[in-house]
Amino acid sequence: MVSRGTRIGWSLLCAFLCLGVACAHNGPEHQIEALSERLIREGASADVLLERAIEYRVLGKLKEAARDLQRAVRLAPSDSLVLLELAQIELQRRRGPEALLWVRQALQIPGLDTGERAAILMIRSHCRAAEGSKLEALEDCSEALKWNPQLISAYLERSAWQQRLQRPRERILGLEEGIRRTGAGLLVAERIEALLDDAQWQQALDAIEPELTSSRLQGTWKIRRARALKGLSRRTEADRDLQSALEEIELRMPREVKDSSLLMDRAFARELLGQTEAAIQDYKLAARCGGGEEAIEAGRRLRRTRSGRPLWPWRT
């Protein structure tokens, strides 16, 4: 018997393959038409309704996607993939309480494997976040990791919540645990960010040096090293790193469609150099290019500091 986790993996793969074929040929509209004809010909099934819901989501038709998924749930009330997709759609529709109801139903499914349960708990964390329950969102990330210690995204999201809740030591220890369990480079970088946020300048610098040596693209790592160097009052070296990072970013920046991650790096480098207005403009542009809430909040924070108050603990 094929486990539900395996079926979910294959279902997701098939959904993405269908999406790729649809986009490459006649687009989601054609795929929706074909799936609708199939539903008429063969009768309703949860799998086909799920496929059509995914196509509707691609088109931004979230109401139609939710309607299909609700039908799918009635046909297959113990299908965790359908319930998770519906919960995510409801979150996109800003219907957090409804999303949480579907998550609760998913958690009650008998025989969930560890990967499924962890995925459901992460969706519940997003529901908690949507309702402003930061501590509960953090706890869900930690619980998800008990079920699936290899879930890198859960370590990263937990780290973000620990930062917001001002739990620096807990954040660092959690990331170190994740690195031991997964060896993920993303967690190595996040740990260094956590050390910097906690003003552990020398520890951060010691961790940055080997990463910088082995990295082909060094701009982001030089910005991190500059931050540590400034914390150690080594301003001349820090400014040299920042100028070098800016030069690399300019070479990598596309001329037409701007890259939000590069814009965020450039903004932060300019901020550390004291180029406040230029940094604010970069944060604004990053927000328009997909930088999300992080870019918006960084711009707001920097605008609040125009009065001349220190931006960072090491700035005088």
Identify the residue ranges that each predicted region occupies.
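Canonical positions in the second alpha-helix
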Residues: 38, 71-72, 105-106, 110, ...
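Canonical tetratricopeptide repeat
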Residues: 51, 85, 116-119, 123, ...
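Residue-level recognition of tetratricopeptide repeat
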Residues: 54, 88, 126, 160, ...
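Register position in tetratricopeptide repeats
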Residues: 58, 92-93, 123-126, 130, ...
